Amino acid sequence: MKLTKIIGLFYLLFSIGCSDFLDEYSQTYIRASKISDYDELLLGAVYIPSLTPVPPTYYVYPSGSNVCDFLNVLDDDSNVTTEAEINRAGGDKPINEWVAMHNVLFGYTTWQQFITNTELTEHNDQTTWVQLYQRIAIINSTLAEIDDIDVKTDEEVADYYRVKGEYLFLRGQFYLLLANLYGKPYDPETASSDLGVPLKITAGVEHDKDKDTQFERTSLDRIYAQIVDDLKASLEAFGHSSKHVLYRASEEAARLLLSRVYLYMQEYEEAKTVLEPIFSNITLSSLVSGDTLGGNNRFLTEENSEMIFSQGSQFSEVCWTANAPDFCVSRDLYDLYDENDRRKGCFTLNTGTDSIALSYKYNTGNYRARVSDVLSMRAAEAWLNMAEACAMIGGASEGTANEYLNTLRRNRIVGYADRSYSGEELVNQIRLERRKELCFEGHRWFDLRRYSVCKKYPYSKKIYRSFSFYTSTYALDRIETYVLEENDPAYVFAIPRTVLEFDTEPMPDNERPERIPLESAD
């Protein structure tokens, strides 16, 4: 079966009306006949690809037009470089491209009420929503049929379990992203009434012409229950057949993601239990025994032994140069690192702007960057998740939490001596280490959300963001400062306008406040 026929079928759903789609479906649908068809579909239409710059001399940069590419400009680890004029000396993109990136990310990084409709730019905000639901539609149809495939050889049986496990993993991951972008953070006390996103796990198109609302938002507790079910089912499938390949989901990836889900749900015993088997199959890389970061020596590459899984592109290679109007690393983050902490070598001081650049965490350059900065998974998170779970359990488990925390630090900080913490201080140290270790990897925004509803040790903070506005001749016009309040409604994204407009009576939206600058500096 040709991959293009399979992919084309599912994309009809988003290009023509529902009733027309049903007619088209009955006329053109061709059932996959062997497990390799589903494997081919998985690679071609379900995994999020790593983008190749076009033309090849350009970079791929965040613009809201790729799945979750904006995540790392939302939180308190980044800021915007402010200078009297735009300075792209030595840059590889035309200045208008850098200005376009600056303008389109304004709504995201300053948490505007309408993130894609601002004074600087106007475009649609549906990309992440649509692309994830497109993939979920393919997964749903595949899972409805894959058990009917006739597998005969041992190799085919192994491939069946592996491929099915990957589909289940990806549906769980995609719904987790959607729920944490368009729903409130999971609060066990309110999850049964808090609205998430539409939950659909069945195949086919369900359209009732007599209903004014076709899509309804599902409560967070039901969405998370489905995510857990999918990831548990993927683990069961991977138990029969799993290969640890960086760009394919595996048992290790499923265990790590499920532990993250349990932390979001504040189910710490479950997080600990699902993680325990993983440590015999993964390793931490050591920064203290190798060369310092710099030059061609970068931290997160395909060759790093602690990489578990990655899909999608890498955008941090280009944004955090600390040249105006690019982004820079916040001083708040930079000052957290001890001078003996080798991770500090990821950052460099841009002497021209006195701002901090993210220089050596990822490969940089105009090429296909394969390790994602928003959708990759690695061993360090497993150590941090286990430490957090044990710290929250408390009692004798605090000793285990300290062991995992100290192990990670010994591999990052030269001359580090083990320390012992307890109670809230232990949790705070783990959160601190998580921020330093996983910065610019798509974690911090979601972590800040979940900390705010943590029952045992809640935490929230204000985030300040300065943003530079430039004239048509690239001279500085003004600098405005915005603030994201503690527990701000803008921690939840609005439902895309095109989704709301589809129905006569739209699903409830997430209200975001108008974002007024605190001050304006000329």
Role assignments for model-derived ranges:
Residues 18-86, 333, 346, 416-420, ...:
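Membrane-proximal, proline-rich intrinsically disordered regions
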Residues 98-183, 218, 233-241, 367-379, ...:
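Conserved, well-structured interaction surfaces
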Residues 39, 45-70, 212-222, 265-266, ...:
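Extended ligand-binding clefts on enzyme/binding-domain cores
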Residues 224, 268, 396-398:
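TPR-repeat structural position
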Residues 1-16:
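Sec-dependent bacterial lipoprotein signal peptides
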Residues 138, 223, 230, 237, ...:
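Alpha-helical solenoid repeat scaffolds, predominantly canonical TPR units
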